[in-house]
């Protein structure tokens, strides 16, 4: 092979990623095979998990689908898992895939309404601390009845809308015309400082909102997928689930909201940045012009979107169908009654969610490796061998640690299955079984905010269109989530250990 051709292949491999990153991925692929053959599948499995976390941490260097996908293909070739195991994992999580395919697209068609509502909130509330608290509380409240990914998609859609409006105006473009807003080259130097401050402002709101989904999601049967799973195993209905989990979930919710206020007041961990006056003026002018120029057709479209939002909330609250199917219904209703009949306009709605959907398939493949190699089995056995009074607290910690690096639905599935088996074998009372079930539920929900790996909503935020725009990297997410992780983790552990 000629030198120029070799250079071309090297340049094409993972595109514009840094050379050191490309070398790391090639090194991972070689190392995995060596470790598997020399040490064994368990060591190779843990190595794969660490490598996948690395690709997520470097999401701004290269979208994790490509390097993660290469690691997945190698794991399948090395028989660390099988295509059938991956397929079964996807079948088990098909509702999540449906949700990403259709619900996120449905939210896209509601972006005019969302931008209208959030701009009123953003421009109407001057206090940043109060605004952050409202974002966090609303996210928590909505996530208690809706899906955390849906709520996150709403927040992301609003943030992209705000960012695009200011960036286009600052670049001298029409904010109502589609134009590139990810490149700062055409931005006058005068606006760079305001833009950086605006990015920090949006980052803090996005993180408050994302944490809010975890605070609210833990409270109810429909808040998170693993809640439904645990509730089904325990035979708990909506009200019973809420009351059983309340001694842990409600104090943590209050503590989370207090943490939100303190972070904004103290300006720690990257929080507390105010909305620049110039940006506020641009957004206010845009909102005023929008209101003045709104035609009867646009008002009718907003009304349709509002009705669709009510139908969406009712459909999700009463669980009339899988979340993704409700999202498809929203797409049909809004497009039919607002005159969106062009295939290309429909296609735009699916652009943001499909890369993440593909990445989630790779994520489930890593989960399949964890399951096939029984990487968590020793930890589960150790916890269940402890004295009964220590089990809830240790189960909470074990769940939290594993949920921070793996899928919390998977972790909850493994633990509740093992604990139920122990209960059916007569090793514990029904009361103790219920206590352990609450520990599993809260342990998989609360400490998992530590990294984007644990919460699907966090992973969605990290790999969404808004993350590179506001410079929200993996490391920055972990740093900004740290105070919440400490407060929610410690109080959750204390409540599980002493208040149940």
From Swiss-Prot:
Keywords: Antiport, Cell inner membrane, Cell membrane, Ion transport, Membrane, Sodium, Sodium transport, Transmembrane, Transmembrane helix, Transport. It catalyses: 2 Na(+)(in) + 3 H(+)(out) = 2 Na(+)(out) + 3 H(+)(in). Pfam families: NhaB (PF06450). GO terms for cellular component: plasma membrane. The chain crosses the membrane at residues 28-50, 58-78, 96-116, 129-149, 150-170, 205-225, 241-261, 311-331, 350-370, 394-414, 449-469, 477-497. It is a multi-pass membrane protein. It is found in: Cell inner membrane. One of its GO terms (molecular function) is sodium:proton antiporter activity. Its main location: membrane. InterPro entries: Na+/H+_antiporter_NhaB (IPR004671). Na(+)/H(+) antiporter that extrudes sodium in exchange for external protons. PANTHER family: NA(+)_H(+) ANTIPORTER NHAB, TRANSPORTER ARSB-RELATED. Belongs to the NhaB Na(+)/H(+) (TC 2.A.34) antiporter family. This is Na(+)/H(+) antiporter NhaB. It comes from Pseudomonas fluorescens (strain Pf0-1).
């Amino acid at each position: 092979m000629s030198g120029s051709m070799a250079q071309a292949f090297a340049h094409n491999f993972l595109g514009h990623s840094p050379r050191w990153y490309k070398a790391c991925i090639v090194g991972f692929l070689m190392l995995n095979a060596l470790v598997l053959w020399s040490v064994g599948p368990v060591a190779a499995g843990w190595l794969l998990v660490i490598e996948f976390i690395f690709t997520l941490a470097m999401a701004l260097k290269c979208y994790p689908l490509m390097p993660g996908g290469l690691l997945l293909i190698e794991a399948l070739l090395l028989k660390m898992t099988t295509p059938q195991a991956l397929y079964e994992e996807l079948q088990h999580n098909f509702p999540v895939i449906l949700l990403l395919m259709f619900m996120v697209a449905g939210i896209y068609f509601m972006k005019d309404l969302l931008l209208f509502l959030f701009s009123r909130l953003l421009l109407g509330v001057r206090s940043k601390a109060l605004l952050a608290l409202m974002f966090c509380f609303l996210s928590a409240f909505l996530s208690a009845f809706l899906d955390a990914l849906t709520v996150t998609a709403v927040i992301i859609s609003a943030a992209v809308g705000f960012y695009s409006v200011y960036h286009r105006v600052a670049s001298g473009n029409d904010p109502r015309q589609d134009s590139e807003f990810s490149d700062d080259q055409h931005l006058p130097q005068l606006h760079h400082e305001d833009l950086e401050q605006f990015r920090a402002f949006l980052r803090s709101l996005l993180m408050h909102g994302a944490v809010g989904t975890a605070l609210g999601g833990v409270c109810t049967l429909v808040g998170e997928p693993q809640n439904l799973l645990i509730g089904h195993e325990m035979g708990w209905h909506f009200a019973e689930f809420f009351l059983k989990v309340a001694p842990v979930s409600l104090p943590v919710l209050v503590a989370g909201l207090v943490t939100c206020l303190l972070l904004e007041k103290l300006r720690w961990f990257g929080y507390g940045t105010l909305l620049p006056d110039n940006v506020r003026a641009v957004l206010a002018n845009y909102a005023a012009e929008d209101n003045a120029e709104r035609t009867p057709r646009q008002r009718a479209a907003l009304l349709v979107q509002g009705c669709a939002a009510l139908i969406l909330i009712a459909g999700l609250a009463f669980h009339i169908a899988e979340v993704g199917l409700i999202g498809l219904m929203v797409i049909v209703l809004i497009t039919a009654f607002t005159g969106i009949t062009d295939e290309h306009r429909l296609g735009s709605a699916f652009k943001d969610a499909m890369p993440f959907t593909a990445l989630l398939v790779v994520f489930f493949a890593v989960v399949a490796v964890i399951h096939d190699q029984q990487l968590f089995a020793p930890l589960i056995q150790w916890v269940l061998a402890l004295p009964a009074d220590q089990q809830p607290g240790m189960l909470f910690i074990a769940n939290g640690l594993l949920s921070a690096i793996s899928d919390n639905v998977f972790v909850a599935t493994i633990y509740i299955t093992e604990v139920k088996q122990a209960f059916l074998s007569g090793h514990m009372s029904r009361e103790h079984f219920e206590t352990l079930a609450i520990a599993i539920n809260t342990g998989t929900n609360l400490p998992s905010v530590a990294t984007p790996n644990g919460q699907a909503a966090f992973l969605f935020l990290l790999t969404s269109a808004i993350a590179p725009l506001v410079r929200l990297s993996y490391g920055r997410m972990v740093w900004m989530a740290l105070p919440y992780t400490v407060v929610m983790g410690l109080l959750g552990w204390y409540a599980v250990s002493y208040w149940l």
